[in-house]
């Protein structure tokens, strides 16, 4: 009865898999309240005249008001859910549809939550409906829209920051790989230089040994030559002749002895 063809504007049975728990609860409560108001409207009167009066006078007006109330309230709830900073509402993602969202205890949103709770708890009392003025709803929506734009821009900046961070991470990986390759090249060059230095040290040590052996051999050779020269000069040494007895006797007195004997002695020399 409530869901007949005349209520084409009813969005019931909506897909709430991607909504936050808060929005899902709010919309469910809204559906129940709307059904209750329509039930009151569709109640049969005691007499035919009363039913006719209700049908022709009140019913169209009440249905229009319920329609307006339902659309405004639903739109406001969806917009408010988008503005909540800790909302996990994410369209097109089924993997995050069951994440927890924060309640209305944040200081920056407590006043708005309280206003919404008071507004959502409004109900029909003693057969009289409590309606929200359309101008009031429009004012609230106008206040919300700039915040929504700022929030959307913030989300765009956040996405840009995420993209930039991802790009920087990729560049960091590339640079790290380049540094690693350079370090490997340096280590290989150091290993090659170490091998070359070791070979030079060994060659230097071998050359030192050869030079030392050559010097020792040359010194030994020079020592042997000097000894041979000394041995070669020994046969040529002259014997000293003492002529003291021969000349002192004749020249000391300025007179020569017997000529014949003297000449014989000289001949002997």
Curated annotation (Swiss-Prot):
Bias (Basic and acidic residues) ranges: 91-103
Superkingdom of origin: Eukaryota
Coiled coil: 155-214
Region: Disordered, residue numbers: 87-113
Keyword Aminoacyl-tRNA synthetase: no
Coarse class of the protein's main subcellular location: cytoplasm
GO cellular component: cytoskeleton; nuclear membrane; vacuolar membrane
GO molecular function: actin binding
Keyword ATP-binding recorded: no
Segments forming domain NAB: 6-87
Keywords: Coiled coil, Cytoplasm, Cytoskeleton, Membrane, Nucleus
Name of a matching Pfam family: KIP1
Cellular localisation: Cytoplasm, Cytoskeleton; Nucleus membrane
Domain notes: The NAB domain, also called NAB (NET actin-binding) domain, is sufficient for F-actin binding.
Function: Plant-specific actin binding protein. May be part of a membrane-cytoskeletal adapter complex.
Family: Belongs to the NET family.
Protein name as it appears in the record: Protein NETWORKED 3A
Protein species of origin: Arabidopsis thaliana
Organism phylogeny: Eukaryota, Viridiplantae, Streptophyta, Embryophyta, Tracheophyta
Gene from which this protein is expressed: NET3A
